[in-house]
From Swiss-Prot:
This is DNA-directed RNA polymerase subunit beta''. The keyword Transferase applies. Its cofactor is Zn(2+). Its EC number is 2.7.7.6. It comes from Zea mays (Maize).
Amino acid sequence: MAERANLVFHNKEIDGTAMKRLISRLIDHFGMGYTSHILDQIKTLGFHQATTTSISLGIEDLLTIPSKGWLVQDAEQQSFLLEKHYYYGAIHAVEKLRQSVEIWYATSEYLKQEMNSNFRITDPSNPVYLMSFSGARGNASQVHQLVGMRGLMADPQGQMIHLPIQSNLREGLSLTEYIISCYGARKGVVDTAVRTADAGYLTRRLVEVVQHIIVRRRDCGTIQGISVSPQNGMTEKLFVQTLIGRVLADDIYIGSRCIASRNQDIGIGLVNRFITAFRAQPFRAQPIYIRTPFTCRSTSWICQLCYGRSPTHGDLVELGEAVGIIAGQSIGEPGTQLTLRTFHTGGVFTGGTADLIRSPSNGKIQFNEDLVHPTRTRHGQPAFLCYIDLHVTIQSQDILHSVNIPLKSLILVQNDQYVESEQVIAEIRAGTSTLHFKEKVQKHIYSESDGEMHWSTDVYHAPEYQYGNLRRLPKTSHLWILSVSMCRSSIASFSLHKDQDQMNTYSFSVDGRYIFDFSMANDQVSHRLLDTFGKKDREILDYLTPDRIVFNGHWNCFYPSILQDNSDLLAKKRRNRLVVPLQYHQEQEKERISCLGISMEIPFMGVLRRNTIFAYFDDPRYRKDKRGSGIVKFRYRTLEEEYRTQEEEYRTREEEYRTREEDSEDEYESPENKYRTREGEGEYKILEDEYRTLEDEYETLEDEYGILEDEYRTLEKDSEEEYGSLENKYRTREGEGEYEILEEESEEEYGSSEDGSEKEYGTLEEDSEEDSEEDSEDEYGSPEEDSILKKEGFIEHRGTKEFSLKYQKEVDRFFFILQELHILPRSSSLKVLDNSIIGVDTQLTKNTRSRLGGLVRVKRKKSHTELKIFSGDIHFPEEADKILGGSLIPPEREKKDSKESKKRKNWVYVQRKKFLKSKEKYFVSVRPAVAYEMDEGINLATLFPQDLLQEEDNLQLRLVNFISHENSKLTQRIYHTNSQFVRTCLVVNWEQEEKEGARASLVEVKTNDLIRDFLRIELVKSTILYTRRRYDRTSVGLIPNNRLDRNNTNSFYSKAKIQSLSQHQEVIGTLLNRNKEYPSLMILLASNCSRIGLFKNSKYPNAVKESNPRIPIRDIFGLLGVIVPSISNFSSSYYLLTHNQILLKKYLFLDNLKQTLQVLQGLKYSLIDENKRISNFDSNIMLEPFHLNWHFLHHDSWEETLAIIHLGQFICENLCLFKLHIKKSGQIFIVNMDSFVLRAAKPYLATIGATVHGHYGKILYKGDRLVTFIYEKSRSSDITQGLPKVEQIFEARSIDSLSPNLERRIEDWNERIPRILGVPWGFLIGAELTIAQSRISLVNKIQKVYRSQGVQIHNRHIEIIIRQVTSKVRVSEDGMSNVFLPGELIGLLRAERAGRALDESIYYRAILLGITRASLNTQSFISEASFQETARVLAKAALRGRIDWLKGLKENVVLGGIIPVGTGFQKFVHRSPQDKNLYLEIQKKNLFASEMRDILFLHTELVSSDSDVTNNFYETSETPFTPIYTI
């Protein structure tokens, strides 16, 4: 024995791998016997050391990692940012999920790596460290759970739980973490049980399929082989692993010298020589051909040389060794072991992290932007995708770094950006080879709140199937859930009202009878307009009506408009009025009165006469908000001031008005009458009882209040026509909105004014007492100044209203005197007496109380009782004659020393009254009056600016203020709504004499999918274009069910009409985009202001020809003077929709249409999809103020902001709009001059191909399914998932992407190769090439699964099994042979031999069998019957008369014979005389073989295209494995 001093002392810990290497070298050097002796000594030494060390494990030995705290904090911060982006709608749910998994996975992995170095540095002799890292007990992942963190877990359904487990077992888990980890532990227990059984069964099947494979012969005589060459990117380690233990299939030459001969087994020395040779001459070295079990020519056994060295002791495998069973167990055993690993880490979510390229130094990065295009990463961040390999330079201060980025990688920085050292600049996309196990997963997104669904125009609104409600997204877009409060009642109103708001009675309830359910999915969706209700009074068409509706199936209406109060959100649009937001003049800004609503009236046919009232608005300062009714009184400025300024103007225009009156009277008469009556029907239906009685009451309305002074009376006759008629008109027009009682609504109004004046107003006497109980009030007393203006005259047409300048009265101030009126049913019992004096809140009847205190007057009529309460004090004067009745007394001036100065600060109105039965007794009522000053500060005209690009036509807008109530007129209220006293009007005028009218139309402009409406007024020469022949009997009709017929659209118009309309340039804008496909153009409608557009004949049912590009820019000015940006560039993202005329008056709606609209009026918006169906929002919605967010804009930035903000637009949270951060995401609901209101909404980003559940406007409750994503998920490479994969490969099941790809490739090869080579060569060679390729591919896949778990299995074990799975071919039906049946499965070698023997071609195709099918297709029926389906197999074998030659192990075990391996092997070997001549034949054949090799290697080009070159042998493309075929 050598001296100790010379022994090498190797001070290094020894783990399992080192031990394997040591044993392998000992066997090489000393052989088996001596090695076992040495190992025995090592064992004794180990046990001795372990005993003396007495390692024990305590809780103090679990050292936590110091950096864990800030790592977790960092991950939490990233998660928080992620959550925020998701909330803003910047990323979608799947991206959030992926990123979340990767954040926590990366944190967990980093902690795992830190753990090793932490133990090694701080405490190398730590028992935990010693145990787990030596492999003695436990492993790294289990220790990681003790001292690291678990991360994200899966729930029982396999879905990720979003809360990661941050604590480890050393620190202790919180309650929530404990419950979540229990999920994982349960999953681990169940997995272990199930998967262990699976692994065991897999082992059984593997052994079953190869149990008969025994080494029976030294050499099978094959000269085929597989080429191995390190040139194809194979690592040296893999090269060595692949070659050692194999046998060469051909001689190896370097230059002309042979360094290794055929059939020589390869040891480590020979491999080193190969490597040296390759390094010396890398390009001239030939590939090395080795023999594998695939190349063995025997059918049911294997030869020594094809198997190679035995892995146990490094010599060639011995004859009689059962290598099949060893192979099956070698593959099955690691599976059984590895399933046990899942016990602790059960359910932990893992994700693959991508390969990253980092910057080598600080500097500016540059690359060619033409070679990249923008995209989104898997995590939703912006990036650039490389088309080709990209060259990137990073310029630091002194050096230029160059980085190559491979094809299909993602660049995560911008060009010319400054990057820091080690910053991630690119992500290498993982190869999309089939080796990645991916699965398609559905992810459902559920609504997080109640709300109503809204989507952008990118969704096709027609469902995917006719009766379904699923829709596919054609491109990535947002879905929005608009917040609402749900009220579950089916007839609840869509209410935005606060106390004392003006509201339309139609919206009190939506009548359920008219809601039709057309959707098969039971959603109250599409109320198709214009359905016949089948009742006579609601017929769709009356062919005798002079003006008929032309309906083109497309309803265009406008957005809900804005009124003056924040809460007053209801659109105040009746018939054709449009409300526009205005702002006060700068001087009044300090008052902070919010926006006014301007109402525009566009008359019949959209034609405005000169001096027509074009728009008006009601100033909230002149509004009486208190409930009740009363009288308005006013005074004028002195006559001289007024007359002096205006006299000349009147003279010049006098003639003009007269002629104008004659021209237009007849033209407009008939429609106007129709308009009035039609309007009346709609309005009086609700307030029927009151109106029926009030109408006659007002004809005989009597004066209860006192007598006006004499001077007021003289001019009464002159002014009643001029002053009254317009007022009546206005009152009627306004009535629907405010529920005023229409005082002058009488039949005579429709006749001539002159005849009716006497009847209507009667004559007034100072003390007339013939048949009246009280004095009659002088209703129409006018100031004396009016008489001078009388000669100007006021022209009032039935169709349009024009102003003479008389109406610009300069009223100083006016007064409102309060009183209260109650109209009670005749039968009601009164609780107060006539002429009594009551206080405030006195009970009048059972249900009504007084709001004012004062004198009560009761008047009983035929059908009802009127009760009036006059507020104020009552005095009994001594001398009645001295009282001046009806006078207004101004407030007293304050005197400093006067104590009574506080008494009267307001104006008072003095009225003279008399007692009933006495003609002499009078008393005086002194009533408070509210004074309103008139103000000239509001300048409307500036809000309708003249356009800069205007041509020579010049429209002028003038401002007129007038008072909406006559002097001393009783203004009564039934519904106690607000009274408006002053109305400001905008009057249209122009200078050109030849222009007869101005045409107003509404232009709808669609810019970038946002629609805005503008009002356009233009001068026209003649109105003939816009009038239609009244009694034209063409077949114009409504389309009954609102689905336009695609073909017969020609019946809409007669030729003449089309010509007359088409002379004008504008047409209804196209709804077809460039590709002529239907876009999803959804128009947000306010359903209570529908407008019918004209239809112009064309091939397309819902559109006319493309808009005429010659529309001048000046036609498109906004109401607020904002020119729409770049509207002149007509491109695919801009649509200009102009509508030919405005045809909207109430009388155009026939009854059934009106009914339908009333249904819609309770709801706020309507929508149209491609199929022209109107979808309504559900009626069960309440919008509450807290759903709305106000945003006030900085004054300077408003002009810029207007171009960006549009009504109906959706804005994401945190968007920066000109010094303004949006606090909440939502839809712009109201736009004011200095602010806008958002309706809160939550965005959800959805990708292409996602499925949207439900329809537009559908009401979703919290937790309803909103959208379903389908995305690809990489399956984690956990062995528990890996084992099923291995099983699938072995079973050749087409469950996921592996097998179909392979099967598809086999099909391709089966078809292509016979085509190239022809028949009969084709089938033989085609099948062989196909089988060779599929075998290599399968080996790679199985090895990948095991290598991912660190398990090393020698390739030859897998090869033996794959050989059995792929060794059959199926006889094809292409050529009928006499030997085999079509479809019969036979071995490849048998088919070749049969073909040779018969001298005829046999047609067959390669087939991939699974291990189970392969076990049931062997030569032994006893083996098959003992595996599965015993009865079927035995019956079939008996019928066929099969013979079992008992060659395998199993058959012999079953029958109790000697198994043919080991010592029992000798019996089964029969030497054949051919063996001796074998080598001789091979020498002769070699010549032909080398030529064939060139032909047959075509297949490497054919098949290597769809595989990726990776860095190792069995994971490379198939190119290196080139089988050699010799025939």
